[in-house]
Amino acid sequence: MDTANDKLERRLYSHDLAPLPKEMDVIFKTMPDQVVRPGYTEEVVQIVRKARAVNKPIVPRGAGTWGLGGSVPVKGGIVVDMTAMNKIITIDEKNMVVTTQPGITWKALGDALDAKGYFLPCYPSSAPSATLGGWIGTGGTGIGAYKYGSAGDIVRDLEVVLPTGVVVHTGDRYVPQNGGGPNLNWLFVGSEGILGIVTEVTMMILPKPEELRVVSYSFDDLKLFSPALKKIVRSGATPMHIMFSDRLHFEYLRAAGKEAPKVGCLITCALTGSKASVDVEEKILDEAIASAGGKKESKELAEHEWHERNYEFRLREMGFGAIPGEILVPVEKFDVVVEGTRKIVKDLKMKAPIIGTVADNNTVMLMPYYLTDEHKLVASTAAMGFAKRLGDLAFENGGRPVGLGVFFAGNLAKYRGKEGAALIRSLKDTIDPYGIMNPGKLVETGTRYGFSMPAFLMNFGMHMMGSVKRILPRDKMGEKEISAMKK
């Protein structure tokens, strides 16, 4: 088992996709006291038992590709880096399941399955870097979810080390867990690491389809996609994936020297199945898009966009930080939320491209992102007000942020209702009586001082960050590059 005590190395674990400025250490102790990298389940058990014996916080971590602070310490403690547990245990072709350690990336697993003629029904857009355990812990919905279901839907069994050091299996490897008590898989899917550490994952796999066809369509504006989207989800067509990006996203990409279309927005759909079924579904999509005034784009553009599906935040290559806001909203409210997002962006004097996916027949995931200098306190913390307002917009329209982490932990009652939130806290207290497993997340906003920040105070603070942003000068990040590109 590898252990890191060096200060510089520990600092690398004090942030995730959206780093906080060092000044936030006044509230949170984001630097771990130690980093350990176990190689197998027994080592995880040892870590947990030793941490419990000395009442030391434990923070499970995959690749840190989420942006809500779920894998970042708030009270120091031990970060358990699971990326060394990255082996495929078995690919069971007879039963069409795969069992792996949780630290393998989705891309590495997908490549191994592809070589044997299989594919993952669902995986994140961050597949090249995201780990199985991390994405399952956030309850991920991603590529393939529209047709095959989200992360939790494809999980058959999890091996989990509880905060007591006990190892449990949550499901049945070959059949769904539909009886014999509550489905324990779903107890841990989306739990954000507060109930235990996943050490083994068994998931369903599927034979590669006869055909995977990608088609792209454009509109003059993202809002104009709404009527077509409402037709598609009611049409009976089941694309594997539907993703969209607006004009500003492509302007930023071109400013970064990347190839990108000059359109108001682009919708890209992946279809899987037999050639005959794909032909039928493509025709349905063509008609739905045309009826709303959209235009079908070239096969070459569609294939280019599909190739780029795992690289949403190439803008970081321009040297900027990118703070993503991720929300889930009803399909019926798509145009309302797009307009609401633009109003937030305008009020906060920002520029924020809107990208996203259609998660299922009822749900859209919007992922507007904001360029910022993550090393400047005022600019970076003020941008958190953007995430707060975006989350509020989702709640107002029957949706929610994609997760809670540190920053939205005060919204648990909004998610689950007062009684539901109390039940989740009771489960946390029962499974983790000493409160050592990823403390300060989901059920509370913890601080370095050992007490939790009241929900109203955290929400008020994030709201005030947005108010600060409104009085700051208009953001100009990226404008120089875009202006140069337009000349």
Indicate residue ranges for each PLM-predicted region:
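FAD-binding subdomain of flavoenzyme oxidoreductases
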Residues: 87-243, 483-487
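Conserved short loop/turn motifs at secondary-structure junctions
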Residues: 35, 97, 216-218, 408-416
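N-terminal flexible segment immediately upstream of the FAD-binding catalytic core
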Residues: 1-49, 65-96, 249-257, 301-322, ...
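Short, ordered loop/turn segments at secondary-structure junctions
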Residues: 62-65, 125, 247, 406
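C-terminal substrate-recognition/cap domain of FAD-linked oxidoreductases
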Residues: 5-21, 207, 218, 224-389, ...
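Activity-critical C-terminal alpha-helical subdomain
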Residues: 408-487
